Amino acid sequence: MAKPVKYDEEEEEVSSSGEEEEEQSDGAGSGSGEEEDEEEEEAPAAAAGEAAGGEEEEVDEEEIEAVTTGAGADEEEEESGAAAAAPGEGDEESQSTEDDEAVVGEDDDADEAEGGAVVGKREKARLKEMQKLKKQKIQEILDTQNAAVDADMNNKGKGRLKYLLQQTEIFAHFAKGNQSKEKKPRGRGRHASKMTEEEEDEEYLKEEEDALAGSGGTRLLSQPSCIKGKMRDYQLAGLNWLIRLYENGINGILADEMGLGKTLQTISLLGYLHEFRGITGPHMVVAPKSTLGNWIKEIQRFCPILRAVKFLGNPEERNHIRENLLQPGKFDVCVTSFEMAIKEKTTLKRFSWRYIIIDEAHRIKNENSLLSKTMRIYNTNYRLLITGTPLQNNLHELWSLLNFLLPEIFSSAETFDEWFQISGENDQQEVVQQLHKVLRPFLLRRLKSDVEKGLPPKKETILKVGMSQMQKQYYRALLQKDLEVINAGGERKRLLNIAMQLRKCCNHPYLFQGAEPGPPYTTGEHLVENAGKMVLLDKLLPKLKDRDSRVLIFSQMTRLLDILEDYLMYRGYQYCRIDGNTGGEDRDASIEAFNKPGSEKFVFLLSTRAGGLGINLATADVVVLYDSDWNPQADLQAQDRAHRIGQKKEVQVFRFCTEYTIEEKVIERAYKKLALDALVIQQGRLAEQKTVNKDDLLQMVRFGAEMVFSSKDSTITDEDIDRIIAKGEETTAELDAKMKKFTEDAIKFKMDDTAELYDFDDDKEENKLDFKKLVSDNWIEPPRRERKRNYSESEYFKQALRQGAPAKPREPRIPRMPHLHDFQFFNNQRLNELYEKEVRYLMQANQKKDTIDGEDEDQLEPLTAEEQEEKEQLLEEGFATWTRRDFNTFIRACEKYGRNDIRSIAAEMEGKTEEEVQRYAKVFKERYKELSDYDRIIKNIERGEARISRKDEIMRAIGKKLDRYKNPWLELKIQYGQNKGKFYNEECDRFMLCMVHKLGYGNWDELKAAFRMSPLFRFDWFVKSRTTQELARRCDTLIRLVEKENQEYDEQERQARKDKRMAKNMTPTKRSALRVSEGETTPSNSFKRRRQSLMDDYVGSGRRKRG
């Protein structure tokens, strides 16, 4: 089998060790994992040829790589290029050979053009044939692979039903129902049901063989050797369970609790199939987009022998993966997202998959969803569902999962519902027991408390805090706004909206538009003081920092994460952040930065829904739930980001709660729902209620209203954080005791009373509360409505516009502070001081008496004339006309041309004169450190200037080399050393250097076009088919050779000049003594050395004159 060919442009020699590694890889293509030098180029067609199993000659494989890379898409371009090259050949050739004695006649030109066209057509035909053969080989591999998968699929179904019947007799009902629909084979009259003796003996023998095979199923005592690291005992047991399912042809659900290593168990199953069964795939993993990076890393970490491909990206990236990586024989595992599984189903349907693995499988519990329908159309041997969320005992959801796992048995939802139909309340426990019997062969679920004894415990504490004055003001206004709905009980949708607004107020009042003071919007203590939870967080974080803890902060609201981000920057804490808008690469980079050893990141901000899935953040030991989710499982998933395998410390969970508000009821309901879910599974009751009803919402909204209206002052205390935590532990203990009593009481209730289980308080004070009276007592009287007597529009406008009407005195308008950006380089500090002074004075002058208290305030002074003049001067000093777009254009121009090339930068700027740009550049140079991200900006500019400097060095080096020749296009020589290129000849390298000197370094598209249009390379398909990236790499190799040659040449010239000066100043006596010391005893040697020295001097002087 031919080895993959590697082109080496600098060394031009393949080491023997590299060849051995390539032999071991056996043409695995992209999955080999071998590292290559920067100058090495691998021929993908050669690797594809090996994967196809063809044993063609090495030259043919190289030609496939050299010719087919761009010819398929650019065939018309090739034809037009070839047609254009032929007529223009005579002109260019005559110009380049003006001094030659031989002149080609017209007849010879015509013959040559005709011969070139024939050769070109022949080459194109051969190219098409080679492309056709390549596609045929790939299709043959795909057909062979799919046929093997289909054969296994037919074999695996034979013993499946028998295995299921051994587990429970329930499957006999569904099997009979299915078999009854099938057509019975025609028999032999009344003897049709009887078997012959030979058939009976054959069946008995087969049953005995199956029994022996079943009794001797595979059970691993140690993990497969291809799995790196050490698997725990329960993980090995999970692998054996998955192997048993595989051997019996059964699909399954791996439902271990979050953090127990479901990903590792799944990867170990694929490793087992690879090592022991010789099954390399293809397998497909479908997971949430946010977890794809983690899947790839885990596969590379635990089972590097598997070749994994991440199928994700924009259309161009997906097209590259589809054509180069997602090919038969080039990958083992395809990892993709739910969205890609739907969007790219045409591509993925080509394959027959060995395993389809669905992570976070609760997404397919609705059989009518697009994802569920799409996953059912893929052809696969096995399906494995992974979920950390416990399954609810809902009949239809369970049928949907069973239908996905075993569609040929659980084909009808009606039959399933009829079989499990409940005739009375006493039968419910029996029905659920039967359901669990059905699920038992497919489902494996284990809890941390049962299997992971070495995992440190998790302790949850509810920290209650009061509200600030601003929070109370907004909370009270929200209740007054929807008085009718809250008092009488309106629609559930309106109540949900009120509940959401109240929860926003509990989190931070700045979530409401206009609540934050500004503009200008500044980060200061007001960010902390105006929200009770922020005061609590500000006390908690320093304590956690002192004891070297690391913190995860979860919130449901992305805008709240913005506020927390401002706070962390204000306090100087280093942090990472992930929410629903974070891209995949940024997400992986943030997780890696937080988890790396010695990381200085103290806080990780995450949204509960986007950041609570598939992330391992076990390096943190504190979880702060800034707000609680309606679904308690979401909060549990968030906690398990830290409380999982690899955690070495006790995990502390702090759940923030605003006292006497809706949040207390939300948390209480979450605790009740967790207890009730456990009770449902224990008692065998069918879970029906999933959403909060209208009555529950009404009670939550009304809760704490009396406390809010009774006082307008802040209820935030100055207690020490240790005291707050101690009180929180007491509160949590009380709530746990209440939940225990709730569970005991709930056991006595019937299923009809399930809705009332959430309301177990004997004294429902919020129902007894006269909410309307409470609000009316604290009502702020709105202004009186004024009834207009005149209803005529014309008369109204006449009166309104009458000249003699007395005009009301208008109150002076409070000036608005302009939004000042950091790139405009204003003196923000001084301007803010002047504006605040002016605004305070005007507000005091126009403010009416408030009813809260009538204390006399100190009289404020307006701006003096000097201060007013100073303010106007400061506004003129900045660059108010420069927008963010202008600033970004200026930065890009600095990166492109350098900071000193003002003329080129000004040419890039639209609407700015050169003088304006020069003034801005001067200020930017002096005050760039005032920018918020100046480090990144300066690094980018310096990187661009370094590229410019390097480009100038390269052009000087090439110019210096070319200046040593009269006609470098014909005479240029390159000192390759020992390793000369095998595929790029000297003529090609000479043309490349001359064209780069003419076109400029970096213009690779123009260089590629020059190669294609040049008659010198009309039939050199290797050169004409090179991409711009390959030409750039070759050019870089030649530049390094030229720079090395220039350095040696400069050294020789310096040595020649030094020897010449020494010879000029040396006397005859010294010369003879030097000759004796150097061993020049014979006159002939002395004569030869002098002659060589003179020749070197002559050549050096001639070169300098030409230079």
Curated annotation (Swiss-Prot):
Ranges for region Disordered: 1-124, 177-217, 1049-1107
Sequence ranges of Basic residues compositional bias: 183-193
UniProt entry keywords in alphabetical sequence: ATP-binding, Chromatin regulator, Coiled coil, Helicase, Hydrolase, Nucleotide-binding, Nucleus, Repeat
Binding site for ATP: D256, E257, M258, G259, L260, G261, K262, T263
Location within or outside the cell: Nucleus
Entry keyword DNA repair: no
PANTHER family for the chain: CHROMODOMAIN-HELICASE-DNA-BINDING PROTEIN 3-RELATED-RELATED, SWI_SNF-RELATED MATRIX-ASSOCIATED ACTIN-DEPENDENT REGULATOR OF CHROMATIN SUBFAMILY A MEMBER 5
Placement of sequence motif DEAH box: 359-362
Segments forming a coiled coil: 121-147, 1029-1067
Species annotation: Oryza sativa subsp. japonica
Protein name: Probable chromatin-remodeling complex ATPase chain
Biased composition (Acidic residues): 8-25, 33-43, 53-65, 89-114, 197-211
InterPro entries in UniProt: Helicase_ATP-bd, Helicase_C-like, Homeodomain-like_sf, Isw1/2_DEXHc, ISWI_HAND-dom, ISWI_HAND-dom_sf, P-loop_NTPase, SANT/Myb
GO molecular function, one term: ATP binding
